[in-house]
Every structure is written in C-alpha cells, then in structure tokens.
Amino acid sequence: MAMDIYLIRHGETDWNKTKRLQGVTDIPLNACGIELAEKTAEGLKDVPFDRIYTSPLIRAKKTAEIIRGDRPVELVVTDGLKEISFGEYEGLCHEPEHYTIPKLGFRKFFEDPEHFETPPGGESLAHL
C-alpha cells in the first residue's frame, strides 16, 4: 500500500528573520510565521492525514496545530524531530555580513555540512 509523506518546515521566527541560529532554543513563530502556516494549511486543506508528527519545539508544534486545524487527526510529538543543537552558538548571527560565530570552521555547516566544526556543547551530524 502506497503512503504519502509530507515534510513541512515550521513557519518563520524572529530568529530566522535576523539570521540567528536557533537549533533547540524554543523560539515561537512570529506573525509572518503564523501567516505562512495558515497559507500552508489552506494549500493542504483537502489532503487527508492519518496523523501529524512534530518536534516538541513551540514553533513546530504551532505550525502543526495550524495545519491540522479542526481535523480529528492525532498530533504526535517526538523528540526525534528536534533540530540539531548548536550549543553555545545558539542565538548568534550566521549572516555573512554580520557573522558573530567565533570559529570559522562552523561555516561549513552551510556549505559542507558533513565536515563542519561542531560548536561547543552542540551536536554534529553523527550525533543525530
């Protein structure tokens, strides 16, 4: 039996907007993020879901709740869907013009993710 799986990223947060690493820091959706989730929900309104999986982070849960709407669909919260932890670098800017991350080896996260320098207290891809 065939199964369709939809992978949907959470809506925008203030940290997304300002190019700050958020990882596992629990930042909520901003107004734009809520609007994006509502537009996604509208686009998926006729798609039947058996269940919806989400990380426990508030931005992901809120996005999932908006997409679910009033459908009687189970919302399964699982730690396995959390984002990678950036450790001490969470909250720092990764925008090239305003880069505030102390180790240049971390830049590989965006260019060559398998070889980036793991931040202090953070996770590598191998940890996941």
Where is each model-derived feature located?
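Phosphate-handling substructures
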Residues: 71-127
